[in-house]
Amino acid sequence: MSLVCSVIFIHHAFNANILDKDYAFSDGEILMVDNAVRTHFEPYERHFKEIGFTENTIKKYLQCTNIQTVTVPVPAKFLRASNVPTGLLNEMIAYLNSEERNHHNFSELLLFSCLSIFAACKGFITLLTNGVLSVSGKVRNIVNMKPAHPWKLKDICDCLYISESLLKKKLKQEQTTFSQILLDARMQHAKNLIRVEGSVNKIAEQCGYASTSYFIYAFRKHFGNSPKRVSKEYRCQSHTGMNTGNTMNALAI
């Protein structure tokens, strides 16, 4: 799968010309680099260690976090951070690049931690979403960051630095619309919440619906069943799974 960006840990200071501009990079500095400009750093590879991030990892990170979207005048091609625990970060990158990386969930948490170093930087979300290959994927990732937000087409355009007419055109080419993406994202979020949240009112609110009755209507239309019905099915599945587990334990004894 294509890489979206890399996190670079500099262990020897160096000067470089990146995109026709001179930079001085310090020992211990951390960079997040858009894959589109990664080649500009290749001549200096002996000065740093790095870990690459795939589109799938970025999508999961955006879905699991709740970072406020902050627009910047010009999309950044790389971000800089300092004052991080360099010893720990060095060990993390070494592990993530090693053959010992056989614990998927643990590795994923380490990858998310590396990304989170830059969460407060302006342009962070823009750099990540610009690396997602499809336009509809970029829109979906933005919505997934905060499903309860009253998203408008203009908000998405501001995040992606694109006009409303062009965004509509690109989404049409991918056979979808902003409204459809917003609905799908909220409905999937609702379905996930139903597994752990008993209150339909709270679920509706967390999915951006001011009216619980309209949320129930939209949910039923989308999935063919009401939220309560789906919740009941999940509970039955969970109960059946527990009984099966108890039966297997009894047989083992």
UniProtKB/Swiss-Prot annotation:
Induces the expression of gadE and mdtEF. Could also regulate the expression of other genes involved in acid resistance. The keyword DNA-binding applies. Keywords: Activator, DNA-binding, Transcription, Transcription regulation. The keyword Transcription regulation applies. InterPro entries: Homeodomain-like_sf, HTH_AraC, HTH_AraC-typ_CS, Tscrpt_reg_AraC-type_HTH. One of its GO terms (molecular function) is DNA-binding transcription factor activity. Induction: Induced by EvgA. It comes from Escherichia coli (strain K12). The lineage of its organism: Bacteria, Pseudomonadati, Pseudomonadota, Gammaproteobacteria, Enterobacterales. SMART domains: HTH_ARAC (SM00342). It holds the Pfam family HTH_18. GO terms for biological process: DNA-templated transcription; positive regulation of DNA-templated transcription. This is HTH-type transcriptional regulator YdeO.
